[in-house]
């Protein structure tokens, strides 16, 4: 199968529409998250990066498969990337706590909390979507070496923070990446126990699986 190299707004809205119909908790991140905050598309996007309630992820994967998507990177329960001729989706399961916060499993004992208060509304082609706040989208990029598209997005986030597109963005030299992208994904052997639990869990049981592993 030939996979798309970009993910257009129409495909993003199709996926967000499915999530909305399921009344599930989600959060758009990455470049599409930034453009949703800006209110217009400012560049092409390779994928849709999205946090999703872990209990809905199996149904989402099944639905995406029905539309021709197939896994290209499967690190569940941490993340799964799927691709098709329509686009690419990078799904990050998160356990939703009673207060609305989402908790995502990382490698080894790492867990990441995505606060409910860090979600806000943006728009893609005029359609409302749930995205991370500008501050949160900036925080989510702190652990990576910035690529050219990241520099573009960070500039937009700086201008949003400063209240207008005419403001000068923060210098790239002041942002110190914590880890390279590859360094963030070196401990793949530690997925074995989590993957076994994840695969054994029935539909709707993935959240319990993550909690069992200390989330």
PLM regions: where:
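Compositionally biased terminal segments of proteins
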Residues: 1-188
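Conserved phosphate-binding loops in N-terminal lobes of ATP-dependent enzymes
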Residues: 200
């Amino acid at each position: 199968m030939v996979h798309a190299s970009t993910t257009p707004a129409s495909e993003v809205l199709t996926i967000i529409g499915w999530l909305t119909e399921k009344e599930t908790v989600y959060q758009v991140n990455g470049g599409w998250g930034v453009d949703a905050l800006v209110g217009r598309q400012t560049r092409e996007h390779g994928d849709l990066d999205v946090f999703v309630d872990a209990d809905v992820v199996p149904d989402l994967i099944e639905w995406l498969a029905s539309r021709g998507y197939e896994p290209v990177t499967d690190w569940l329960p941490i993340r799964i990337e799927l691709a098709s001729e329509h686009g690419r989706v990078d799904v990050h399961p998160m356990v939703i706590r009673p207060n609305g916060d989402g908790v995502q499993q990382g490698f080894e004992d790492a867990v990441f909390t995505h606060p409910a208060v860090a979600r806000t509304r943006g728009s893609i082609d005029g359609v409302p979507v749930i995205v991370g706040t500008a501050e949160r989208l900036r925080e989510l990029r702190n652990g990576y070496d910035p690529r050219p598209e990241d520099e573009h997005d960070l500039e937009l986030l700086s201008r949003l923070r400063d209240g207008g597109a005419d403001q000068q963005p923060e210098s790239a030299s002041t942002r110190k990446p914590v880890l390279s992208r590859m360094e963030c994904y070196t401990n793949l052997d530690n997925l074995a126990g989590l993957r076994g639990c994840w695969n054994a869990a029935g539909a709707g049981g993935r959240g319990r699986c993550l909690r069992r592993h200390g989330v």
